[in-house]
Amino acid sequence: IDIDNHIYLVVDGYIALILNDGSQNSKIYSIQGKGTFLNYFTLLDQSNNHFNFKTLSGCSLYKYSKADMEYFLSMFPENFGFQFFIMKNQTTHVYFKSLMASSPASEKLKTTFSNMALLHGVLSDDGTVILPQAIKTSHLLSYSNLSKSCFYKDLQYLKTTNQIEKKEKCWIIHDQALYTMIQNGQTSF
């Protein structure tokens, strides 16, 4: 990936954005999926990329030069809707991460599951929301910013209270309100 000169559209698959803060234990900032542009913010503010990208599954990407994207989005007013869609998607990820970061420690894991469900969940016929197999427990731990002990304690609580379960390597969320939100196309609380 040439982050200095290109922007990438995720056609399929999942990619983790890991904050490049110089520490060895950098955490997942967001998980991007189909329809998301990687490295897009660098086009807007001409800044350096602050993320490392890690594929979580097999992925297909389209590569666009920054110069072509800038020309395409700025020269034609009819592309304003396209720009809006890209920015809405990007800011939804930022908004969800801020909600999770500002929530009390006891709610961080539940918020993590809700965020991932709103971004990537698949509705099941039984009224549950299924996270893609590519989003593993270790990814949820990294995204939540919880210590391992707090994470696994909270994970056990969510399991024993039947809010989540794991079947066939996929996390399943039992939350009718969340299911209804996704069904109605809502992307935030």
Spans of features found by a protein language model:
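A short beta-strand-loop-beta hairpin characteristic of the jelly-roll/cupin
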Residues: 16-27
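Polybasic "coupling" helices that flank or enter modular domains
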Residues: 81-145
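Structural motif
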Residues: 14, 58-60, 170
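Short, small-hydrophobic-rich alpha-helical interface motif
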Residues: 13-15, 35
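Conserved short histidine dyad/triad with adjacent acidic residue
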Residues: 1-3, 21, 32-36
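Cyclic-nucleotide recognition modules
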Residues: 29-95
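Regulatory nucleotide-sensing modules
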Residues: 1-12
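Phosphate-/nucleic-acid-contacting segments
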Residues: 118-189
